[in-house]
């Protein structure tokens, strides 16, 4: 079993990286539960975390707040650890519409999803790696706190094959069917097997190119080979191979029988309650749907939406904690939370959103109450898995600050780059002033980011700049992740000189060519101009030796003051370090990478379908109040998660609603 991490890099830790690595390693050795790496933009936080992983040598889970960011981290860690198991675990849905019911219009929305096969393979590769070795790093999105099958069942049902092992061919076939492999002699793909005389070929769920060929002599395995599934080329002989289940929700036959009995019992109880409350239509609907699922489970061993019965399949009591990816890790694993100021609130919010939707389904007879136990972890359940956790952020949130007694600061950049200088200029004449600044940057072949407060202002500014001949593009929330990465690439290549947007805090905007970040209406206190957002936005100009930030404002707000002072403090620290070590700041020379494959596989931005404002005139006063409250709550949550376009859209809708009401 391979169990050492090997870090491969031509760089050595520099600046204050060695100090940060030493402090974090010491903290873990001393058994500190919570630590925070407060790392300024561009200080090489991923490299620091890689060194930490190598030193403490524990299986590690890195949680990012969306698939794109997870994809970027996956490619970086893969470069640092080419000889270890770096895995990727995100939601495998390219498109996902959860089942839901709208009582007002009596509309049931069926679950509709398309599963990305590449990501499903990567998920299986991640869970199987955890059972085979200790040198595992899994980069995951928040989907790692969603329910999976039992790790004990998963481990127990692994089919282990060795050369000279005595097993009948038909018994092997039965075992493969039990772990949800399908026999398919024609279309040979992931999760299937085919039989040709005394040869059984198995295509593991965690692979996409290589299959396993098992050759029998009578009732004995004569030879096990790894074969290229497409060309048939033999890649090597194996003494032993472990075939992991093709689904994370595998259940033994005797357990399945018990689960079916429990589901039937729950169904009878729920039908009784519904009849007593006069819910006859709901009772009929529930019985019809559940009986159909039970029939499928008896005949096929699974049914559509089997995860809704996961509590029964794992024989857990009501309300108990579901199994998740975290349970597949050994007890001494380490968690790294990237961009923790966004990720932690996201983990916290998952449970409530899921329960609200499922409760409606249960109340109206679409699901049994046990479906509520197929859920993401509550935050306090997630906390129970925190043995060693490191939060990584340039602007740690309240949770991290409260739980960490001492921040590990990483302010010095290996390149000697300083935090940008900040100018505050009056709002009057801001556009003309901005155009002058843009022209100066274009002459020096540098790029500009401009952040505005509203969608309308972004659009108007973009149109105006285009009219006067400036190469500009507008980054808005409807742009898909991959398209967004391409626009950023085009900015770097010089197809555009200026990018305008509301939320310039999304991942992938660390662009060395950007020497100016302009913040319009910086004194309009609110979620778009909070101290945390401002510090993050200022960081966008910290990759260039000429980096500068201009805030257009008529007064200096509290948030502006905090952000300006923090930037000044960091800059002074960086200048001191450069003087002591004779370092001259150099703009980062970062290759313009093509979009990585894991990101392509994960291409999926959280899609928000902003509904048209509901007609308040048709609602009662109570309903009206409820809609407004819900939208205000959503707006605040979106702002907390730094998803400002969504928050701004909701804010505009709220104003519309209030005007109507």
From Swiss-Prot:
The keyword Cytoplasm applies. GO terms for biological process: nucleotide-excision repair, DNA damage recognition; SOS response. GO terms for molecular function: ATP binding; ATP hydrolysis activity; DNA binding; excinuclease ABC activity. Its main location: cytoplasm. Disulfide bonds: none annotated. ATP binds at residues 39-46. Residues 625-660 form the UVR domain. The keyword Plastid does not apply. GO terms for cellular component: cytoplasm; excinuclease repair complex. It is found in: Cytoplasm. Residues 26-413 form the Helicase ATP-binding domain. Signal peptide: none annotated. A motif (Beta-hairpin) lies at residues 92-115. The beta-hairpin motif is involved in DNA binding. The UvrABC repair system catalyzes the recognition and processing of DNA lesions. A damage recognition complex composed of 2 UvrA and 2 UvrB subunits scans DNA for abnormalities. Upon binding of the UvrA(2)B(2) complex to a putative damaged site, the DNA wraps around one UvrB monomer. DNA wrap is dependent on ATP binding by UvrB and probably causes local melting of the DNA helix, facilitating insertion of UvrB beta-hairpin between the DNA strands. Then UvrB probes one DNA strand for the presence of a lesion. Forms a heterotetramer with UvrA during the search for lesions. Interacts with UvrC in an incision complex. Belongs to the UvrB family. NCBIfam families: PRK05298.1 (NF003673), uvrb (TIGR00631). This is UvrABC system protein B. It comes from Bacillus subtilis (strain 168). The gene is uvrB.
């Amino acid at each position: 079993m391979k169990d050492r991490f090997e870090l491969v890099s031509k760089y050595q830790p520099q600046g204050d990286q060695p100090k940060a690595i030493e402090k974090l390693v010491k903290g873990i050795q001393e058994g500190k539960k919570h630590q925070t790496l407060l790392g300024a933009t561009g200080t090489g936080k991923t490299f620091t975390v890689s060194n930490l992983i190598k030193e403490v040598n524990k299986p590690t889970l890195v949680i990012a707040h969306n698939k794109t960011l997870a994809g970027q981290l996956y490619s970086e860690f893969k470069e640092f650890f080419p000889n270890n198991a770096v895995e990727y675990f995100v939601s495998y849905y390219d498109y996902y519409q959860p089942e839901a019911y709208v009582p007002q219009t009596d509309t049931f929305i069926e679950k509709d999803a398309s599963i990305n096969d590449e990501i499903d393979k990567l998920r299986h590769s991640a869970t199987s790696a955890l059972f085979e070795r200790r040198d595992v790093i899994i980069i995951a999105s928040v989907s790692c706190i969603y329910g999976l099958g039992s790790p004990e069942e998963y481990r127990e049902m692994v089919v282990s094959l060795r050369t000279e092992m005595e097993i009948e061919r038909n018994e092997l076939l039965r075992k493969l069917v039990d772990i949800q492999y399908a026999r398919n002699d024609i279309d040979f793909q992931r999760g299937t097997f085919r039989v040709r005389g005394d040869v059984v070929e198995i295509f593991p769920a965690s692979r996409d190119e290589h299959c396993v060929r098992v050759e029998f002599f009578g009732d004995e395995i004569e030879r096990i080979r790894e074969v290229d599934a497409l060309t048939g080329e033999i890649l090597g002989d194996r003494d032993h191979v472990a075939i992991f289940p093709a689904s994370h929700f595998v259940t033994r036959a005797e357990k399945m029988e018990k689960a079916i009995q429990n589901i039937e019992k729950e169904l009878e109880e729920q039908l009784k309650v519904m009849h007593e409350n006069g819910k006859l239509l709901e009772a009929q609907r529930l019985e019809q749907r559940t009986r159909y699922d039970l029939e499928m489970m008896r005949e096929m061993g699974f049914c559509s939406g089997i995860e809704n019965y996961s509590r029964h399949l794992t024989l857990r009591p009501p309300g108990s904690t579901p199994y998740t990816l975290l349970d597949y890790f050994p007890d001494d694993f380490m968690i790294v939370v990237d961009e923790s100021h966004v990720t932690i609130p996201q983990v916290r919010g998952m449970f409530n959103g899921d329960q609200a939707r499922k409760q409606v389904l249960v109340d109206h007879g679409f699901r049994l109450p046990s479906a509520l136990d197929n859920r993401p972890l509550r935050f306090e359940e997630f906390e129970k898995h925190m043995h060693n956790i490191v939060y990584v952020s340039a602007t740690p949130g309240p949770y991290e600050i409260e739980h960490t007694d001492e921040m590990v600061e990483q302010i010095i950049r290996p390149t000697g780059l300083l935090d940008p200088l900040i100018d505050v200029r009056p709002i009057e004449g801001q556009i003309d002033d901005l155009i002058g600044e843009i022209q100066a940057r274009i002459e020096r072949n540098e790029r500009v980011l401009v952040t505005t407060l509203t969608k309308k202002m972004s659009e108007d500014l973009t149109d105006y700049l285009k009219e006067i001949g400036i190469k500009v593009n507008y980054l808005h929330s409807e742009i898909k992740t991959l398209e967004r990465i391409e626009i950023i690439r085009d900015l770097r290549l010089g197809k555009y000189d200026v990018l305008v947007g509301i939320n310039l805090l999304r991942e992938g905007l660390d662009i060395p060519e950007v020497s100016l970040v302009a913040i319009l209406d910086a004194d309009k206190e609110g979620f778009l101009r909070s101290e945390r957002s401002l510090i993050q936005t200022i960081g966008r100009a910290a990759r260039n030796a000429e980096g500068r930030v201009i805030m257009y404002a008529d007064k200096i707000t509290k948030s502006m003051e905090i952000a300006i002072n923090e930037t000044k403090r960091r800059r002074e620290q960086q200048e001191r370090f450069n003087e002591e070590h004779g370092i001259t700041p150099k703009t980062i020379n970062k290759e313009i990478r093509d979009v990585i494959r894991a990101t392509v596989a994960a291409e999926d931005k959280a899609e928000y379908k902003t509904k048209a404002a509901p007609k308040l005139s048709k609602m009662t006063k109570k309903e009206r109040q409820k809609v407004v409250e819900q939208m205000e709550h959503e707006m605040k949550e979106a702002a907390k998660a730094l998803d400002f376009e969504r928050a701004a859209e909701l804010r505009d809708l709220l104003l519309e609603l209030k005007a109507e009401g």
